[in-house]
Regions:
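Terminal targeting signals and extreme-terminal segments of soluble enzymes
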Residues: 2-185
Length: 185
């Protein structure tokens, strides 16, 4: 059973990698396809992921995204490919900025600005992480979904409980849709 789950997870991951692998049309211009997830509209996370992939293809590999702002302007249509137009806004010594516009049928459907930064030493400001159980002690999102699948309309159950390329595990006591209420530190 576990080997079969690993095969399903690997298949889902390969499908995601293929979806994010854009076709280069010319410099700064890419085309992406869409995955049908049960409707006529494109999933927004797919558009964001493909836009980030397009931006990454124009940036030095030593830099990683550290800030991203995105706007969903119009719904994407499953029946058409998406064109990603990358504007090389700035290439500095430490920071790189890109703007990506996703286009369908000649209209922008999505606009994103992303900043990349090379790894540098500097001050770190963060709150110490709580002492929490490790992933192996937490229930997977898929297991939780299977427990409540009977509450989902039958026509959506297979989609709801399908294997995903990225595994999510909730902390004990946290539900899928809401966690425990905590006061900020």
């Amino acid at each position: 059973m576990k080997g079969n789950l690993n095969k399903m997870k690997k298949k889902a991951l390969n499908k995601l990698i293929k979806l994010l692998d854009l076709e280069a049309l010319e410099e700064n211009l890419y085309r992406g396809q869409s995955e049908n997830i049960g409707g006529s509209r494109v999933f927004g996370g797919q558009v964001l992921g493909q836009a980030l992939t397009a931006a990454l293809r124009t940036v030095d590999k030593k830099r990683s995204a550290h800030s991203l702002h995105a706007y969903f302007l119009r719904p994407g249509d499953m029946g058409y490919p998406i064109i990603y137009d990358v504007e090389r806004t700035r290439d500095g010594r430490s920071f790189t900025t890109r703007r990506v516009v996703a286009i369908q049928k000649g209209e922008p459907i999505f606009d994103m600005v992303v900043s990349f930064h090379k790894k540098e030493k500097g001050p770190s400001h963060q709150i110490d992480m709580e002492d929490i159980p490790g992933p192996e002690e937490c229930v997977s999102e898929l297991e939780l979904k299977k427990q409540i699948a009977h509450k989902v309309p039958e026509k959506f159950r297979d989609f709801f409980t399908r294997e995903r390329p990225i595994e999510i595990r909730n902390l004990p006591g946290e539900g899928m849709f809401e966690g425990p209420k905590k006061k900020p530190p």
